[in-house]
Swiss-Prot record:
It catalyses: glucuronate acceptor + UDP-alpha-D-glucuronate = acceptor beta-D-glucuronoside + UDP + H(+). This is Putative UDP-glucuronosyltransferase ugt-46. Its EC number is 2.4.1.17. Residues 1-17 form the signal peptide. The chain crosses the membrane at residues 493-513. It comes from Caenorhabditis elegans. SUPFAM superfamilies: UDP-Glycosyltransferase/glycogen phosphorylase. GO terms for cellular component: membrane. It is a single-pass membrane protein. Keywords: Glycoprotein, Glycosyltransferase, Membrane, Signal, Transferase, Transmembrane, Transmembrane helix. Glycans are attached at residue 304. The keyword Transmembrane applies. It comes from the Eukaryota. The lineage of its organism: Eukaryota, Metazoa, Ecdysozoa, Nematoda, Chromadorea.
């Protein structure tokens, strides 16, 4: 009887499970972990999930990105060295204030190498045939590059889901058909709490140019797909804009509120609480130190402490000395010997190249997290109810820091202040540890997230199953997806009408002036002067 029950349960589970492919290029450890968490949630729900990790950086083997889903690693990319060099370039210049042209060049270099890596992947026919024969029902990929969606179309996977790994960047608005909120959301350039005219103008200008750059880069990627699959291969933009659901790996409680759509679903925080494990004795001992508690400091992986100005970490440790009642747990790169050496003279500092971040953030003695504002760190802190000092460096980090600042559970500081105004960092630390409003607001953010009617996991699983079961969700896709900004805002109507109006109004005014009494007076004055 028990055997029959087990067989019946297995049959029922198989009948209602779907085969899902998660496309997860190794662009950073945080992206691998984020995609792995999403895959694991679907796998725990009984679906047959495969995570395809294209190991661009040689980090997949050592990154514990997947716990339940299947993991398939593809390595041996010739362009990996060039990709690493681009990322190292970001680390080396991370403390500089890049000009607009520097940002354009950096993004161009990044996407160009990404496109070349995609072209390499397209040549792996054995992998392609294996995946095509697997007959997947659904496909997930991030927004960073459109390689995955072109590949999914070639594999003939019927249902596509876009993962926005961070708050929307300018090109994503094209996929959705949403108007870009350039006056309120700092997704292209910085906007203060009350944006000035100059800030709004720069945000709009950078957003438009970023979209243009992405289009040009996408055309090059399109050429790779047409070379492989024929000249009639559809536009990658049209393939991507036709996704059934956009899963945003952020939480609407944290983000700056803006316009949304029926097929945009926020799933920030997937698997975060699952990673909260017990600390080993070493870290548990460190968390017990400090008369008033513990402060955690981490700049993430892009701001590599070995490559940035050594004065940065020395400044941080000098700040630590001024708060003797608090113990500081600090992350530094494993090759950063100078920081470790200097830290020996700081009695209330512990430095390590790896720290159990989720466990640290949930520890009751933690009072503050000083972070680079990467979204994984933001959402982990939010779910733990920990106030933040945000020091953004690049990418979406500036937008994330502004969102925290606007919601009132953290303070933003400029990265240059680590070198030029360390007293401003000190003031921020003092403000948060002495003013309870930040911790109270952080706890409210935590409570709002955890008491939502549906969890991120439930939304992900139920929405995915709903879309696949019903063969798509065309009925809720935004009508303007794929429309250009030109037609969405009726600029093709407004501008011609404007110029036509000008062409009629100016001659009319000129004619009225010439034949009016004013015109006659001017004409008489002219004659008098000639006489």
């Amino acid at each position: 009887m028990r055997l029959i029950f087990v067989l019946l349960a297995t049959f029922v589970n198989a009948a209602f499970s779907y085969k899902i492919l998660v496309f997860s290029p190794a662009t950073s450890k945080s992206h691998l972990i984020s995609n792995g968490r999403l895959a694991d949630e679907l796998a725990r729900a009984g679906h047959d999930v495969t995570v395809l990790e294209l190991d661009f950086l040689g980090i997949s083997q050592t990154t514990n990105s997947v716990k339940v889903a299947k993991k398939r690693i593809i390595d041996g990319f010739q362009e990996s060295t060039n990709f690493k060099n681009v990322l190292h370039g970001f680390s080396e210049t991370v403390m500089e204030e890049p000009s607009f042209t520097d940002e354009i060049k950096g993004w161009w270099a990044y996407q160009n190498v990404y496109n070349d890596l995609c072209a390499e992947f397209l040549k792996m026919d054995d992998i392609f045939n294996e995946l095509k024969n697997a007959k997947f029902d659904g496909f997930f990929a991030e927004q960073i590059n459109l390689c995955g969606f072109g590949y999914a179309h070639a594999l003939e996977i019927p249902r596509h889901f876009l993962i926005s790994s961070c708050p929307f960047a300018a090109p994503v608005y094209d996929f959705t058909g949403l108007p870009m909120p350039t006056s309120t959301v700092a997704f292209a350039a910085d906007l203060s709490i009350s944006p000035t005219y100059t800030e709004r103008a720069r945000n709009l200008f950078v957003a438009v140019l970023t979209k243009l750059e992405f289009t040009l880069l996408n055309n090059r990627l399109q050429a790779h797909f047409q070379h492989k699959f024929g000249e009639h291969f559809p536009s990658l933009y049209s393939v991507t804009s036709d996704v059934d659901v956009i899963f945003v790996a952020t939480d609407e409680i944290i983000d700056i509120s803006t316009t949304t759509l029926q097929n945009i679903v926020h799933v920030g925080g997937l698997g975060v609480d699952d990673d909260v494990a017990e600390m080993d004795n070493v870290f548990a001992s460190e968390m017990s130190k400090g008369k008033e508690g513990v402060i955690y400091f981490s700049l993430g992986t892009i701001a590599n402490t070995t490559k940035i100005d050594s004065k940065v970490m020395r400044t941080v440790l000098d700040i630590v000395k001024k708060f003797p009642d608090y113990h500081f747990v600090i992350r530094a790169d494993k090759y950063d010997l100078s920081t470790r050496e200097y830290a020996k003279s700081v009695s209330n500092a512990f430095v390590s190249d790896w720290l159990p971040q989720p466990a640290i953030l949930h520890h009751p003695r933690l009072k503050l997290f000083i972070t680079h504002s990467g979204y994984n760190s933001i959402v982990e802190a939010a779910r733990a109810g920990v106030p933040l000092i945000n020091i953004p460096f690049m990418f979406d980090q500036n937008l994330n820091s502004r969102a925290v600042e606007k919601k009132g559970w953290g303070i933003r500081r400029h990265k240059k202040q680590l070198l030029t105004e360390p007293e401003e960092i000190e003031k921020a630390i003092s403000e948060i540890i002495h003013n309870k409003k930040y911790s109270l607001k952080a706890q409210r953010i935590r409570d709002l997230i955890k008491s939502k009617p549906l969890s991120s996991s439930q939304l992900l699983i139920k929405t995915t199953e709903w879309a696949i079961k019903n063969h798509g969700l065309d009925e809720i896709k935004f009508e303007s997806r794929g429309q250009t900004t030109w037609t969405y805002y009726n600029l093709d109507v407004i501008i011609p009408v404007f110029w036509l109006s000008i062409s009629l109004v100016i001659p009319t005014i000129f004619g009225w002036y010439k034949f009016s009494c004013f015109g006659h007076v001017e004409e008489k004055k002219g004659k008098s002067k000639r006489d």
